A protein has these predicted regions:
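Membrane-embedded transmembrane alpha-helical bundles that form the catalytic cores
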Residues: 2-492
Length: 493
């Protein structure tokens, strides 16, 4: 009897307590998802309304585990966004409805502006006044940047007629609270997810389920076996760059470039994979971005959901490339600064955005003036790749560093203290780490057609082969992660 009481107490403690490390690859979530999924499969055969309500309830539980009491922000934003968008569409077309659109977008932005940017704004204001005021640190609701942008995209798409009609409240709530997308996206358009939510799912699409399992396996490998391992040395470098040699600093920058890709694309794979298991097909968020030969191509391959969001809801409304060459450059530059601010209220993210903005402007200028017409051979492609990857890695320094002093110290060490002796010492001290980084880059260099071939081979293999591969990966994750997978980088945004 005592054991049952203790078990029940532990169960209710789990249900009623926040977990700051809660995400798609933590073991408590995996256990919860197995129970959820078993019931979901059973419910899916009956009324769709019950299934939707069940998924929404689990999504809100997911939000509570990640955010605690701040989870109430999600249903508040959802309901207010839905009602205001419906009200906006009842307004007279023209200037009145346009004003309504502005009011709805501002209302959707208010929680994000308050929780993410109010302290930063106050700090700037008091620095200008030279006062000693220090605002209290404010907790940032996990995923707020993602579900806010998703709400805005729905409102604008309804206004523009890109999505034919406003959804029912239960469908919109499902769309905005869908738990795989909640913590770190990818930001998903209404036209992608809502039609699938509104369509009954009587039969399981086996190929989609197997694709989901493939993506989950890829996501676990990327995050738990690659990104978290590489992060160990990266953290040493960025916490105290002066304690490492110039070559060690250079390797830390290379390591973080690899880490952030495998960390974030790993989460995207997990999110898209979990959604696929449930019968929902989402768009890819990454397409081998470090294979890019210029910065424009990089942004067509990196965090595709965010880059296309800024293209459609900021760059094009600002005029895009329709108002002359100078305006095109300015629009690109402004879009990247806002992208930097989206990541966080910090001068470091602004610098990261400025660097990408400058890089995009330079590439557009060269392309518009015929300066990018160089011989198309493996040597020029290699040089283009090296310049692009190096520039992106340089920008990552400001993205990862805690402050400008850390970033400049690291860059100064790389430029002035590198030596062959330091390189040899590093190779002797961190051979396994370097091997993992180089192997990871080699994996990333795979052709998209070869990746698709591997995926199709997995999908078409027997269930026993799939089960064995999944079991081996899970065992590796358990053994190598020491039962503690680190939080995803993008959960802080």
């Amino acid at each position: 009897m005592t054991n049952i009481t203790q078990l029940m107490t532990a169960f209710f403690d789990f249900l009623s307590s926040q977990d700051k490390n809660w995400s798609l690859c933590t073991f408590p979530f995996m256990a919860s998802f197995l129970v959820f999924f078993a019931i979901y499969i059973g419910l899916n055969r009956y009324r769709q309304t019950w299934t939707k309500a069940y998924v929404i309830a689990f999504s809100l539980f997911f939000a509570f585990k990640a955010n605690g009491v701040l989870m109430w922000l999600l249903p508040i934003v959802t309901i207010s966004s839905w009602y205001l968008t419906r009200f906006m569409m009842r307004l007279k077309r023209g200037k009145v409805r346009k004003i309504g659109l502005a009011i709805v977008i501002l209302t959707e932005l208010l929680p994000l502006l308050y929780y993410k940017y109010s302290n930063f704004t106050l700090e700037i204001f008091h620095e200008l006044l030279r006062s000693n005021f220090t605002p209290e640190k404010m907790l940032l609701p996990v995923g707020i940047s993602f579900f806010t942008f998703q709400a805005i995209s729905y409102t604008v798409d309804i206004y523009k007629g890109r999505y034919p009609k406003t959804a029912e409240l239960i469908d919109y709530t499902f769309y905005l609270t869908f738990f795989p997308l909640l913590i770190a996206g990818p930001i998903t358009r209404a036209e992608v997810l809502l039609p699938q939510v509104q369509t009954p799912k009587d039969n399981v699409n086996e190929n989609l389920v197997y694709k989901g399992l493939w993506l989950i396996i890829c996501g676990l490998i990327k995050k738990a076996l690659i990104a978290d391992y590489i992060a160990q040395y990266n953290n040493i470098v960025f916490d105290a760059p002066a304690s490492q040699s110039g070559f060690g600093n250079l390797m830390g920058v290379l390591g973080f470039s690899v880490q952030i890709y495998f960390d974030f694309s790993g989460y995207s794979d997990l999110a898209i994979g979990v959604a696929a298991l449930m019968g929902y097909e989402l768009k890819d968020n990454f397409r081998f971005p470090y294979q890019s030969l210029n910065l424009t191509e990089f942004w067509h391959r990196w965090h595709i959901a965010l880059s296309t969001w800024f293209r459609d809801y900021l760059y094009i409304p600002l005029g895009g490339n329709r108002k002359g060459e100078l305006r095109t450059y300015l629009n690109s530059f402004l879009a990247m600064i806002v992208a930097g601010l989206w990541h966080g209220a910090s001068w470091m993210f602004i610098v990261w955005g400025v660097l990408h903005g400058i890089g995009l402007v330079i590439h557009k200028f060269c392309r518009n003036n015929g300066l990018d017409k160089i011989p198309d051979n493996k040597y020029t492609k290699g040089i283009s790749w090296f310049i692009t990857f190096s520039y992106v890695s340089l920008a990552w320094i400001f993205f990862r560093a805690a402050d400008m002093t850390t970033a400049t110290t690291l860059i100064d060490n790389i430029l002035h203290t590198i030596s062959l002796a330091d390189a040899y010492t590093f190779l002797m001290e961190y051979p396994l780490w370097l091997a993992v980084v180089l192997i990871s880059l080699e994996i990333h260099s795979i052709r998209e057609t070869d990746y698709n071939w591997l995926q199709s081979k997995f999908i078409n293999s027997s269930w026993l082969v799939k089960l064995c591969i999944f079991a081996v990966v899970m065992q590796l994750v358990i053994n190598l992660s020491h039962h503690s997978i680190q939080p995803f980088i993008y959960t802080q945004f």
